[in-house]
Amino acid sequence: DGAVHHHIAALAPDLLTITFNGLSKAYRVAGFRQGWMVLNGPKHHAKGYIEGLDMLSSMRLCANTPMQHAIQTALGGYQSINEFILPGGRLLEQRNKAWELINQIPGVSCVKPMGAMYMFPKIDTEMYGIHDDMKFVYDLLVREKVLFVQGTGFNWIRPDHFRIVTLPPVHQIEEAMDRLKRFLQNYHQ
């Protein structure tokens, strides 16, 4: 989409900044719960904080050594992400198709995600009589065999959102959106 990421550490080199990242999102290996943090800038005022971080990181027994090696390989290897996010790329096409189709369903709207592999559509709860988003996603799963996650599962306080993952192939996204549309045609809690 032409968006450019600016590292906050580069914007304020005189301040201590902490940057977090991980394999799951940055390197498309969902489920690999391996991450890291980098501290930049003057660290002398944060000595106690850094010692605490060091202590916490040393408390884990049985470190996930294979995943630690995966980080090194990921950071030092060929960076293929542009092949997926530029026009014609799989992740961009999947995101665009999911966003296009979800916004064609009456009473459902969504902002186009930028940099995420998820969407968080809003559903008109009055139109569909939804008062329990957990029941909504459960009913959808039972009737149409489509799994979404209720918005309240992400600390959203109203039952008017749900989460969609945009990682499946386009044909599966199309099928899921067709099933959601069919489900909503006669759904009312």
Where in the sequence are the language-model features?
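Conserved core segment of the aminotransferase class I/II
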Residues: 10-89, 99-100, 184
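Conserved PLP phosphate-binding loop immediately N-terminal to the Schiff-base lysine helix
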Residues: 1-8
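Conserved glycine-rich beta-strand-loop-beta hairpin in the small C-terminal domain of fold type I
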Residues: 72, 88-102, 110-124, 158
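Short beta-strand segments
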Residues: 21-22, 36, 112, 120-122, ...
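A short linear hydrophobic-aromatic micro-motif
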Residues: 19, 106-110, 147-153
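PLP-dependent enzyme catalytic core of the Aspartate aminotransferase-like
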Residues: 129-131, 139-148, 154-189
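Residue-level recognition of strand-loop junctions within catalytic nucleotide-signaling folds
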Residues: 40-41, 76, 122-124, 167-169
